[in-house]
């Protein structure tokens, strides 16, 4: 039987929809009927494209309602569904289109969600990394799920949970009150290929990959996921601070595919720093200068150092309080601050690599060599010098701050002495602070300050990025 007929506007091709079982016969009879035209080169031989599906949306209210077709095809495109052919009835009460049969289920879900035939808007989440930040995020989602459904019509559906050893995926989602035990019992071995194949293979609409790891391997998945119309929310700062060309490519792919690549928590945990810079830039402002204290660990260390607590002890305290990395040399090297400054500079419109950042470190280079045990043995040798310098600092009523700075396109990080009249002077605990000098905020820079470390606030920042994808 003959289904739909699709004719191109240019009038140089016509497509006919038939059942898969009738495809060979249809080609045979048409090639016989048009044998003379084919022989003369007037038309090409008739060929069959198999494993396709026709979807039709029908509704009386479609008549004289502008934008229905645009909304339909825009929604399909944002979810990576390719429309092979389409037709609209002259009565304006139906639109039919052809897609790959593998995309049929996804197409139906997308249409139902977009045209409010579904009770809720759904976001399908793949959460990678369930340590301190990822675990806190899952708990925050669990606590908010019911409220978001009732008050915002948004259903957060966790369809994938991944850690370093195990991974589990299900279209039906998971019980977040018992996810660790379920992962332990039902999870498959976790590796990059499995993660990629499962997410892409599920081909599920409104998908978001949430990276709460610090893994370069996981960050290498972003490009492929974005190309398959999966949005990416990253607490992981490796990709955004990698080679500039890679950073730009990820943002370009996301824009072209109509999905999001968000990484607000790369700098300042839950503080709205990157979004603020983006808002300033998009509204026509220009970032002239950035000054910031971006390491909660280093700020904690320099706030704790005193006559009673030597430098080496403050490092140990930061490790015990889980402010620092397990290997605190990562924090002391300034690498983390350099990455954060590079990300801010790029978001502010500057093309900067990590190697371009000038470093003025306060620990000799040889302390970063050898084992961690060697470091702990050597670091007390720095205590006397730091105490002598601290006493001078105390007499001058100054504090140490490890400052990241961008000015005139040049970036630097280093230990600075700040006086009582400086905005950084009273910065407490592990807090972060950033000053933005712009064309509009030139005399009095914009200041953002608050908790810059901690699983709860970082997870909340990741959650906020997820919510922005839902436009709630």
Label each residue range with its predicted role.
Residues 2-6:
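Short, small-residue-biased leader/transition segments that mark boundaries at the very start
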Residues 216-227, 237-263:
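Rossmann-fold NAD(P)-binding glycine/threonine-rich loop
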Residues 304-305, 312-426, 431:
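Substrate-binding/catalytic subdomain of NAD(P)-dependent oxidoreductase enzymes
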Residues 124-130, 134-227:
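N-terminal glycine-/serine-/threonine-rich beta1-alpha1-beta2 phosphate-ribose binding loop
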Residues 56, 289-294, 299-302, 317, ...:
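Catalytic, metal-anchored helix/loop core of enzyme active sites in primary metabolism
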Residues 255-258, 262-321, 331, 335, ...:
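Rossmann-like NAD(P)H-binding beta-loop-alpha module
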Residues 22-39, 102-118:
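Charge-rich, low-aromatic oligomerization/scaffolding segments with amphipathic character
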